[in-house]
């Protein structure tokens, strides 16, 4: 069994989330262990069919970049804590109109993971965990356009709302009795509350399944390589503005792609993943994810707090 790094749960806006800093998402960090990580996520969406009348209040960025910094502490065999702070860049482009957007601090998250199931066998290890915690409104909410008019809440780096994140993760190593084949499922939701200005962004649900194979592993497990296909389902509920539901702003999307992790040395992984839109719903103002690219690096270490 490889020396595992924890899964970093990244989701600060209704976008496809990058699978985290480890090839297996269910295990927590080892007791007394620490981890620092950086994850870079690029997301593009198609243009709205018609936005000649201005920026719709439910518009999503046509391009966004999120750089996530996190630190994780494994304080118990089955528990760990993660603090995540994102830096977000949003851009909105429309035909015949200047591009608007900007960069700012995103909403921070404080997450706790609990592994409630582990079973070892000759085939491999099966593990399951839950993760939960608040998303705190630390993000910037004052981006404006060229006329100094406030951009919609959906284009701001921060939401202005205190939301709740909950996830369930399952990892099954040794699929079909192949010890190098790993099935990994991440199912999570971000439950939204009203934010700024008088906007409640639609809550999000995401299910991501990754089937990875380890074609290379050094004898001392210091270096390894995982690669495999991923399938992601995204669901966004309709936004609400001033108490009025914005029908057609939410929808569903299906992404397919590939993700690869490489262990460079003990405790250090780098990863790269790409996903593309294969199917989506067609709400009046729904802007599905078209392409999703992410890469990152993580390093684990021991923490001596007392």
Give each language-model segment a name.
Residues 29, 40, 73, 85, ...:
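Residue-level signature of outer-membrane beta-barrel architecture
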Residues 47-57, 197-306:
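Outer membrane beta-barrel transmembrane domains
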Residues 24-32, 78, 117-127, 175-181, ...:
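Short loop/turn motifs that connect adjacent beta-strands in outer-membrane beta-barrel proteins
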Residues 38-44, 83-87, 128-136, 168, ...:
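Transmembrane beta-barrel strands of outer-membrane/channel proteins
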Residues 34, 65-69, 106-112, 128, ...:
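Hydrophobic, lipid-facing positions within transmembrane beta-strands of outer-membrane proteins
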Residues 41-66, 154-155, 249:
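Surface-exposed strand-loop-strand hairpins of Gram-negative outer-membrane beta-barrel proteins
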